[in-house]
Amino acid sequence: MDRSMRIAFLSEHASPVALLGGEDAGGQNVYVDEVSRNLARRGYAVDVFTRRTSPAEPEVINWAPGVRVVNLSAGPAEFRLKDELWPLMPAFRNAFLQFMLHDEVRYNLIHGNFWMSGWIAIELRRRLDIPVVQIFHAMGKTKRRHQGAVDTSPSERITVESEIIREVDRLIAQCPDEWSELVNDYGAAPDKVVVIPSAVNSHMFRPVPRDQARRYIGLDTNGPVIVYVGRMLPRKDVRNIVRAVALLAREASTTSARGTPLPPVTLLFVGGETSEPDPIATPEIGELQRLAAELGITERVRFAGKRQQEMLRYYYSAGDVAVTTPWYEPFGLTPLEAMACGRPVIGSAVGGITFTLMDGITGFLVPPRDPPSLADRLYQLLSQPALRERMGKAARARVEREFTWSTVAHRTDLLYRALLSPQLSPRLPSRILEMERKG
């Protein structure tokens, strides 16, 4: 395959290699991995530049056909939290330029991920005079608005984001909510912002029969199971789910409030820093254990620890319903993963979740920080098997129709071509995709 078009994918803290385990991996890692692979399948050569976090990491890894991961030295070769990396970005920029000289490689376009890589991208644009596409994955103003004093982002973040928005050639928003943030909060030119939603690997995340999935993961219950998969962070508000389950348990002995009581419900948490649930390594697990004990539902709450991506379909499928109720979520891949596994989702009506989850069709939207509302919707789904099945099928169909990585790569390819060959490309609308909010 002729790979004459070469892309520099910048992702300073989120390497696709992290998906193999050993360090925390989130949505940005998945995005970088899947988009680079799918762009390579379309004929691009993609080099993913990330920061070396261990002396044992080689400089270049042949990650997939047409994709290399380049580990650049910027500061000590050790893991650091992403909010501690900002002072190392000039060294990252310099290491990129040195790699170009040493490898004698030239790039047609730079694709920045996150605000720090965006800063590197515009620094390189000034030196190399090549176009830049930027995706933020999360915006500083929105994070500060929701997290307030507990926001650990560097003080320069919002100023740098504004500079990036002014200077790059195109901005990718993952949902209409993010498009509005870029245009209304930061003053981005509307025709510079393109909506290209992220996606899910619909082969890796596929339905497994419930009983088979429970046997596979060793979950010994025939009763209803609520599953949460994801990071154990305060902004994910997993404590909200514990409180909602406690409300259901409290009402289990009465028929006055909701009609027929539910059988005992199991709440399964999948995630954390280690494969075995460890409240020292993952403090939020300890908080959840204490809260469950305080509310008298310790025996109903189980922790699976961190699991590899290819195992997650069994955990989603073991559940009757998946729940994610963060009070802040830029996009959120876990609702799509659950939907791909044919499970209805109850999610907070925030950020990208309001875009991916179709209220009343693929699940339900609920207000954040509202355990009674969540308990109401949990009861509705857990007490109505036919409703669960109908919503689960609609969820899977929506993913197959709108949220595949090949579709993301196709839309990104259109964007690249419009920048690289404007005289040959059709005019690109400011929103590549206006997604149907109807089934």
Give the location of each predicted region:
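N-terminal subdomain of nucleotide-sugar transferases
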Residues: M1-V69, E436-G439
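Carbohydrate-associated surface elements
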Residues: D177, A199
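A short helix/loop element that forms part of the nucleotide-sugar donor recognition site in Leloir-type
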Residues: R206-L219
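Conserved donor-binding/catalytic core segment of Leloir-type glycosyltransferases
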Residues: D220-K236, V242-V245, L268
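Short alpha-helical donor nucleotide-sugar binding micro-motif in glycosyltransferases
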Residues: K306, Y314-G319
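Aromatic "clamp/platform" in nucleotide-sugar-dependent glycosyltransferases that forms part
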Residues: W327
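Short hydrophobic beta-strand element within catalytic cores of glycosyltransferases
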Residues: P344-G347, L357
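Conserved acidic donor-binding segment of nucleotide-sugar-dependent glycosyltransferases
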Residues: D359-G360, F364-P371, Q380-P385
